[in-house]
Amino acid sequence: MSGSDKLPGLASDAVLKQSIPVPDSFVEIKGIDYSKDSAYNMKAVDLIESMKNMGFQASSVSQACEIINGMRSWRGKHIDSLPEHERTGEFDDEGYQKSTIFMGYTSNLISSGLRDTLRFLVQHKMVSAIVSSAGGIEEDLIKVLAPTYMGEFSLPGKGLRDQGMNRIGNLLVPNDNYCKFEEWIVPILDKCLEEQEEGMKKMGSDGLNADSPACWTPSKLINRLGKEINDESSVLYWAHKNDIPVFCPALTDGSIGDMLFFHTFKASPQQIRLDIVADIRKLNSMSMAASNAGMILLGGGLIKHHICNACLMRNGADYAVYINTGQEFDGSDAGARPDEAISWGKIKAEAKQVKVYADASIVFPLIVAATFASEKPN
């Protein structure tokens, strides 16, 4: 090595490499300047707007809000200008086509306090249809019967089991809650079975079609449970009241599955039957009828794929917002970015789409505050 004080050319070229001229389209990274008066006690809408050029997941959260506002504000043709066969999907109060918004969420989000946010959306008819895992059905009902409590992630499982306490992350659900759930749901299942049997007796030449009183589906049972719970704190109550279908293709995967299993013995030899084929026809038909389709998917797995696959039936959704923490290296559905769904035809190539890598319990209340709840509902 030379003792010269001259900067080595190799190092100089590597460290001081010249950039191309910055394109006019580049946006400068900026955050929130709390030294300005406008930043104090900032509204959610303004906070989200200030996060737009912050980078990382802050920018993705802001983009998610833009996409949700886009699906909410989209308007198509007036119903009077459409031929009869095109008068499908949803229309606003003035008769213009509007987006059909599919919302999916996993059960843990209903177990958490996010349930109240989800209930708000259903209460005010801000979504068109829901897909949930089984826990998202039962936990909503159980919370009417008895509360869920704060715990800690680190509580030992053996001690909790001895105490009859079930842990969901840092939430605690006394096992007595599930006993109360059984006491509440069994008489309802008895009545549903009775109605199904009556429908079977009256079944005519049309056979067992989807409109038959003898045909019970998961969504029909969920609607009935929402009616029977009759409590305004419940998501399912408002779904029933506002005629918003709630689909749960894995309804047996949880406590409600336990109750259905137990009921097959109590009701022997007759057993209630639920038709999942009629439900997939109903969900897919909603998608095909939609003049514009948006997806808001909180979590991954079954709830995410079920909605994405329904949107395949119309050659893809027009808007998509994913919120989950899944990574794509293992090929999981939760980890897949929206671009993977584009390859399958489940999201349109030109769709507005984003994946927010975050815990939905943190970011979704903020997103709702800046979109659906930015103004008081009528």
UniProtKB/Swiss-Prot annotation:
It holds the Pfam family DS. Pathway: Protein modification; eIF5A hypusination. Its EC number is 2.5.1.46. It comes from Debaryomyces hansenii (strain ATCC 36239 / CBS 767 / BCRC 21394 / JCM 1990 / NBRC 0083 / IGC 2968) (Yeast). Catalyzes the NAD-dependent oxidative cleavage of spermidine and the subsequent transfer of the butylamine moiety of spermidine to the epsilon-amino group of a specific lysine residue of the eIF-5A precursor protein to form the intermediate deoxyhypusine residue. Its cofactor is NAD(+). Belongs to the deoxyhypusine synthase family. PANTHER family: DEOXYHYPUSINE SYNTHASE (PTHR11703:SF0). The keyword Nuclease does not apply. GO terms for molecular function: deoxyhypusine synthase activity. GO terms for cellular component: cytoplasm. This is Deoxyhypusine synthase. NAD(+) binds at residues 107-111, 133-135, 139, 253, 300, 325-326, 359-360. It catalyses: [eIF5A protein]-L-lysine + spermidine = [eIF5A protein]-deoxyhypusine + propane-1,3-diamine. The active site is at 346 (nucleophile). Keywords: Hypusine biosynthesis, NAD, Transferase. InterPro entries: Deoxyhypusine_synthase, Deoxyhypusine_synthase_sf, DHS-like_NAD/FAD-binding_dom. Spermidine binds at residues 138-139, 258, 305, 331-333, 340-346.
